């Protein structure tokens, strides 16, 4: 499944 909101957030922020 998708990563945790933390990981997704950090990956999408940059």
Swiss-Prot record:
It comes from the Eukaryota. The lineage of its organism: Eukaryota, Viridiplantae, Streptophyta, Embryophyta, Tracheophyta. Keywords: Antimicrobial, Fungicide, Glycosidase, Hydrolase, Protein synthesis inhibitor, Toxin. The keyword Hydrolase applies. This is Ribosome-inactivating protein luffacylin. It catalyses: Endohydrolysis of the N-glycosidic bond at one specific adenosine on the 28S rRNA. It is an enzyme of class 3 (hydrolase). Has antifungal activity against F.oxysporum and M.arachidicola. Inhibits cell-free translation in rabbit reticulocyte lysate system. Has some N-glycosidase activity. One of its GO terms (biological process) is negative regulation of translation. GO terms for molecular function: rRNA N-glycosylase activity; toxin activity. The keyword Hydrolase applies. Its EC number is 3.2.2.22.
């Amino acid at each position: 499944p998708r990563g945790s909101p933390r990981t997704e957030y950090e990956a999408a922020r940059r």
